[in-house]
């Protein structure tokens, strides 16, 4: 297995699937958003303990969007809502696709499946 396919971390999603973060996807995330480089733990925590989980519009590939609020993101000039996009390829496993901060307004564009009360 190549270095880029090496698993960096594995976390459990709300549904119980083991979601992996590979070196390739981690490089993708920090290349697109270098300010997230110090927030790997928060990205993983978003999958493990989300505030909300969304599904994309029907025409988009099957993936989930976990959202969690981290006020400390504001300390580096980012929106405090962190979204982690991931895919569950079976009931037991999946992988992280990407992660990004968003505003409250933008997150309403996708369909909420679950919300912490």
Model-derived segments and their meaning:
Residues 1-117:
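Ribonuclease/tRNase effector modules and their secretory precursors
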């Amino acid at each position: 297995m190549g270095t880029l396919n090496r698993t960096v971390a594995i976390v459990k999603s709300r549904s119980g699937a083991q979601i992996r973060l590979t070196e390739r996807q981690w490089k993708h995330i920090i290349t697109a958003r270098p300010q997230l480089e110090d927030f790997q733990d928060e990205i993983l925590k978003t999958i493990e303990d989300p505030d909300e989980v969304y599904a994309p519009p029907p025409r988009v590939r099957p993936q989930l969007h976990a959202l969690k609020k981290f006020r400390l993101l504001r300390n580096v000039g980012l929106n405090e809502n962190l979204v982690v996009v991931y895919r569950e390829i079976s009931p037991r496993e999946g992988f992280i696709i990407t992660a990004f901060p968003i505003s409250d307004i933008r997150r309403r564009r996708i369909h909420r499946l679950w919300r912490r009360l």
